């Protein structure tokens, strides 16, 4: 809400996000130290305006954009396997299954943290998908693309997300699975779609009840 009351320039958005993430990072680090534990979490966030998408990422949760013709992975996994792939020591397929794909280069709550910011044009018609690594491990990009484009209604889109989470579970995925989706038919349809996005998140974010998340978050902040 504070961000929405400011001048929505790219610089202001990224400064505000960086401040927020740094504060959260320090609180998580302090919580872990005070309780004698190690913890860390990833974050991928997107802000949609009438003509732009603004993104920030720490870790390996992904953001995809379906632009009406193709599915684009907007974020890059911040993992040791991807680092090795970029150095030419692993192929893309090897990086996908390599055990180092689960080794994060950075996260919130542990070590050094430097968010990656970017922005891109928002297409007239399209969709955004945010997914944790538990979702992206089990589904191909072709399956994700179909999931975003085949449903014709909000209810069908929500059903596809629920089916995707169930499929990942049945395939043996034990990591956290969180999926959020937002689709729009034109740039004027953003407000109502945002409400549906929140509803989908509430249904699919993990296994614990929402009040349990609120309680644990309250212990930290």
Functional labels for PLM-detected ranges:
Residues 1-221:
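PP2C/PPM-type serine/threonine phosphatase catalytic domain
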